């Protein structure tokens, strides 16, 4: 998408590459980060043979993250992501030009500050051998109250300590934070044992999976979470999965078929996690 829509090759990372996919990965990438030394050793000869100057790096694990939800914590004990300092050789293999680290999720600059302390403590020994340091995503710099001046000071300080390093950030959600809603329509209202469910023409498991996996609680326009109001409903998805629902929400009026239900600030996940489970249509 970066290449086709923006005309720019991507900084690419995957927990594991396959020989079938790797030629296309190289075509679309300016930088490729490997999750393990074994993956680097397997595919680096292909990078050399391709000869387009792709810069290769390795993902590191500083064994520190302030992400509280285990599902989103890339540095949880036993994580499959990245290499710990004790497993890196004193001299990096020829061809490794950078370190990539991803430790954040909708995080502040102060969490980045703490993470940098751990990265420098454990990995700065190798900084003289690399050209770039990618600090990954999860930096929610567009959220109200984010201290951008503190972020600038952090990055300037890091650059002053290691002037030869190119410092890279990959904010993701920050680009789409509070920029789009998911609008659904009530197609039926059912009741079972006193529980009313408004069935929608969208699906939590297909279109909003984080609501079930986290669970992330979306804001619903014109409703309050909880069962304390007069007009209380579950919101149900239109798939066969029994757990494809969320609730309860209290509305200020009785819902009716054809009414629109608006989920606030959903664009950053509905864009990338849709699927055709049950033949459910993608959001338009």
PLM features: what roles do these ranges have?
Residues 151-169:
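Polymerase palm active-site segment centered on the conserved acidic dipeptide of motif C
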Residues 60-62, 137, 204:
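Short, small-residue-rich loop/turn micro-motifs
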């Amino acid at each position: 998408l970066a290449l086709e829509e923006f005309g720019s090759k991507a900084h690419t990372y995957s927990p594991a590459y396959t020989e079938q996919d790797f030629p296309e990965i190289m075509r679309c990438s300016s930088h490729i980060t490997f999750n393990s030394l074994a993956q680097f050793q397997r595919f680096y000869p292909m990078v050399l043979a391709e000869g387009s100057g792709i810069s290769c790096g390795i993902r590191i694990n500083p064994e520190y993250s302030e992400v509280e939800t285990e599902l989103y914590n890339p540095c949880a004990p036993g994580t499959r992501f990245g290499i710990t300092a004790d497993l890196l050789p004193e001299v990096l293999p020829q061809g490794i030009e950078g370190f990539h680290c991803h430790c954040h999720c909708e995080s502040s600059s102060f969490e980045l500050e703490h993470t940098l302390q751990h990265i420098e403590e454990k990995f700065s020994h190798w900084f003289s051998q690399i050209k770039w340091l990618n600090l990954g995503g999860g930096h929610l710099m567009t959220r109200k109250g984010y201290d951008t001046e503190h972020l600038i000071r952090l990055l300037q300080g890091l650059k002053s300590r290691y002037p030869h390093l190119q410092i890279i950030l990959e904010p993701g959600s920050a680009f789409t934070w509070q920029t789009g809603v998911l609008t659904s329509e009530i197609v039926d209202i059912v009741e079972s044992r006193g529980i009313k469910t408004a069935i929608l023409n969208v699906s939590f498991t297909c279109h909003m999976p984080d609501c079930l996996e986290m669970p992330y609680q979306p804001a619903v326009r014109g409703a309050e979470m909880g069962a304390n109001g007069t007009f209380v409903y579950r919101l149900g998805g239109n798939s066969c999965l029994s757990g494809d629902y969320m609730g309860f929400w209290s509305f200020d009026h009785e819902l009716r078929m054809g009414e629109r239900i608006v989920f606030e600030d959903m664009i950053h996940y509905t864009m990338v996690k849709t699927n055709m489970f049950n033949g459910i249509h993608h959001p338009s």
